[in-house]
A protein has these predicted regions:
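Append "and occasionally in soluble cytosolic enzymes with long acidic Gly/Pro-rich linkers
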Residues: 214-221, 296-383, 387-388, 448-450, ...
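Alpha-helical secondary-structure segments
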Residues: 27, 104-111, 145-151, 200-201, ...
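Ligand-site clamp/hinge motif
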Residues: 190, 218-263, 391-393
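Surface-exposed binding/hinge segments that line
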Residues: 90, 127-180
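Gly/Pro-rich hinge or "lid" segments in bacterial periplasmic/extracellular proteins
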Residues: 64, 166-225, 347, 351
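Extracytoplasmic/peripheral linker and loop segments enriched in polar/acidic and small residues
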Residues: 302, 391-402, 407, 416, ...
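Long beta-strand-rich cores associated with HINT superfamily self-processing modules
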Residues: 497-522
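N-terminal lobe/hinge region of extracytoplasmic solute-binding protein
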Residues: 29-82, 113, 195-199
Length: 522
């Protein structure tokens, strides 16, 4: 433990040492201020969710090379159960948690049950099954030590059910270890904020909030990861991250601005890796905000679509790192809309505002993450909206604070991303186009958009088994949100990551924001 503390201190004390990173350790510079918890039942931020993929395993996963396909992970195979709304899973007989405890069907049942009962941010994904506190106990049947039957009451097919089980919230935790660390019936949630109990390639060795996260190779993992240790170094400033990667003080650097990426492309000691991403970026209005009723006026939503200078954002400000995208399904997903019906048109926006009774000088606050590209985009939005005499007050905050504000509806407007939790159109439709009384606190709930009819259509699309009909339903859902909603989808990103040349075998999934650490070599 002393050596690990020393390791954290080494990269936390000074940037002037310029020491080469250890051969058995990957050092990554990335902001860590968005992390709230490492409990897979609660984690819902990009960095912590991406860490989940390296420390926990699900029954199945999206294939790393072809994410439209499914690959076995903790389950060696699966088949239909006793009804069309059930599946039988057979577990790997030799899988073990980092504690040495074997992975059993009881761990699977415990993990999914606790996620439903904790009812944290990502629990709405499992709610797609129709699972509730009241019925979850009756949804599983143990067939033998390595086989269980899972069922669900919701009208969804087996393919969507499998996709839901690839999300981090469906990760399998070590029930014995977690229960040993439970306090006041919290299912071990408090302990898992800063610890891990998984069967993935790595385990959490040490975490210092906002400063460093140390992952150590899980000695029980099979196969073993190529490196012994991963150090995520919390570096809040993008300029400092660029300096660290140039000096060789870190091996990988994330969240660099367009100008920094351009400059690093000329450095012969490193390269820029580009990975496809499912992240879509949107402007959202809190329609329930009492201080500014204009936010609930559809005229403002409509005008906003014509006050975003999409071309300038994508090509000039962000230098092509982000493409124009105006629908909630990301490019690459089945049925994603590729059209771009909106462009920058101040005169049209003014006309819409006037007809809708939005007075000149209308003002609202825009909450954004205090990192690129959010600050840059927010300033551009502030300037473009001002041309129509709509005043935006910028409120940059740490990422963790932004998520807390969103979940508490404590904001007026927001510019942020949404990433797919699994590779299926339902992952984004259930966020942008679903909000029912007493239901999950989706994105539509967070902006206070009451949509009973649209929510019903979202459920219909989720349960449709005919591929062509399902695609048509998602097209209609996208068009509705695209044309008339408090969401203005603007961009889709591609992950551009600076990597030192001595680092190889780097790969990143479409739905995550960090590398798969188990394959990385130095």
């Amino acid at each position: 433990m002393r050596s690990l503390i020393l390791l954290v201190a080494l990269w936390g004390s000074s940037f002037a040492l310029h020491a080469a990173t250890p051969k058995d350790t990957l050092v990554v510079a990335v902001p860590l201020d968005g992390i709230i918890s490492f409990d897979p039942a609660e984690s819902f931020e990009t960095v912590s969710n991406s860490v989940q993929r390296n420390i926990y395993q699900t029954l199945v996963e999206a294939d790393r090379n072809s994410p439209q396909k499914l690959s076995p992970l903790l389950a060696t195979r699966w088949q239909q159960g006793s009804t069309p709304h059930s599946l039988i899973f057979t577990l790997k007989p030799d899988a073990r948690f980092s504690s040495g405890n074997p992975v059993t069907v009881q761990d699977v049942i415990f993990s999914l049950t606790r996620a439903v009962q904790l009812n944290k941010a990502p629990s709405f994904i499992l709610a797609e099954f129709g699972w509730t506190n009241e019925n979850i106990a009756s949804q599983f049947k143990v067939l033998n030590d390595h086989q269980l039957e899972m069922q669900w009451p919701a009208q969804i097919g087996q393919n969507l059910a499998l996709r839901l089980l690839t999300a981090p919230v469906a990760s399998v935790v070590d029930s014995k270890t977690v229960q040993q660390n439970a306090v006041n019936n919290d299912f071990g949630n408090g302990w898992l904020h800063t610890h891990s109990a998984g069967s993935g390639a790595f385990t959490i060795q040490q975490y210092v909030p906002q400063q460093a996260l140390v992952l150590s190779a899980n000695q029980q993992a099979n196969p073993q990861p190529k490196l012994k240790r991963i150090l995520l170094k919390g570096v809040a400033d993008a300029g400092a991250r660029r300096l660290l990667i140039q000096q060789g003080d870190v091996d990988v650097a994330y969240q660099l601005g367009p100008d920094q990426i351009d400059a690093l492309k000329r450095d012969k000691n490193l390269r820029i890796e580009a990975f496809p991403s499912s992240l879509v970026y949107y402007l959202g209005f809190n329609t329930k905000d009492k201080a500014q009723p204009a936010l609930g006026n559809p005229a403002l939503w409509q005008a906003a679509r014509w006050l975003v200078d999409y071309q300038s954002l994508s090509q000039d400000l962000l230098k092509g790192q982000y493409r124009i995208h105006q629908s909630f399904l990301p490019q690459g997903f089945d049925g994603a809309l590729e059209d771009q019906p909106f462009h920058y048109d101040v005169a049209k926006a003014k006309e819409i505002l006037a007809k809708g009774g939005i007075k000149p000088g209308t003002k609202f606050a825009l909450t954004v993450i205090n990192q690129p590209p959010y600050i840059d985009v927010a300033q551009a939005l502030q300037a473009s909206f001002a041309k129509a005499d709509v005043q935006i007050e910028l409120q940059p905050v740490a990422e963790s604070e932004l998520w807390s504000k969103m979940r508490g509806r404590d904001f007026q407007s927001i510019f942020i991303y949404w990433g797919a939790d699994y590779v299926d159109p339902n992952t984004n439709a259930s966020a942008f186009a679903y909000n029912v009384p007493g239901g999950s606190k989706t994105l539509a709930w967070r902006v206070g958009w009451d949509i009973p009819d649209l929510s019903a259509k979202t459920r219909t699309a989720a349960g449709e088994s005919d591929a062509a009909k399902r695609r048509a339903l998602y097209t209609d859902l996208q068009k509705t949100v695209q044309q008339n909603s408090p969401f203005v989808v603007t961009l889709q990103g591609a992950q551009q990551v600076a990597v030192r040349n001595n680092v190889s075998h780097v790969q990143q999934g479409i739905g995550v924001s960090l590398l798969f650490f188990d394959t990385v070599q130095k």
